[in-house]
Amino acid sequence: MTSTQSVAVYATLILAIFCFNDIHCDPIAEARAAAFGEREARSAGEWKQFDVNGEKVEVNEQENREIIRQAGGDGVEGSVMVIDHAKGLIIWSIPRAGECYLIGGVDKQLPDAQELLHYFRSAQGSADGEGVQSALDYVKAEDRPVTDLNLLAPEVREACQGKSVYWLEKSSGDNNEPEKRRWCVYAYVRIRGVLVRYRRCW
């Protein structure tokens, strides 16, 4: 037995004693971390996954966060929206627009993680059938680029690498300028009967 293996075995025995009353403790994994400097990153809470309206929704009640992933097409990745209720922030990666966006504040129409989990569980598979009840429209604040990229959630950081990031603001509903543009990219995410929409035109 090598000296490294001896350290691992010894660490396993020691950690097994400390793990005796902790059902979530894995002495083997802890021993590997102690002997070889390995340690897995652990989320602060458990993620629940649902397939709704063609979107993959992940909900973490402890962190009060939601992730909505849309399927891509035509060689373009789908958009990813992270709703962080704890920080009051929405992070949105829209590959078709070639940019990423931040929304400061989470509209009260959007359910928090606990409400969304309760909704999915009580719907018993019928959530797909709920129609759109309201919509939240956003426009890009051209003069407000995001300078602190640490605000980007880890789930979209790679997708937003090297792209422009802007704040989105609620639309007043009277902006007809896109009608004069040549073409537009439309993006929306549906969350329990509420549409979050964005339109970028050139």
Curated annotation (Swiss-Prot):
Keyword annotations: Antibiotic, Antimicrobial, Cleavage on pair of basic residues, Disulfide bond, Fungicide, Signal
Record bears the keyword Disulfide bond: yes
Chain ranges of the BRICHOS domain: 73-168
Propeptide: 26-181
InterPro entries assigned: BRICHOS_dom
Leader sequence segment: 1-25
Alphabetical GO biological process terms: defense response to bacterium; defense response to fungus; killing of cells of another organism
Tagged with keyword Disulfide bond: yes
Disulphide-bridged cysteine pairs: C100-C160, C184-C201
Gene3D superfamilies recorded: 3.30.390.150
Function: Has antimicrobial activity against the Gram-negative bacteria E.coli and P.mirabilis, the Gram-positive bacterium L.monocytogenes and the yeast C.albicans.
Protein name: Arenicin-2
Organism: Arenicola marina
Organism placement in taxonomy: Eukaryota, Metazoa, Spiralia, Lophotrochozoa, Annelida
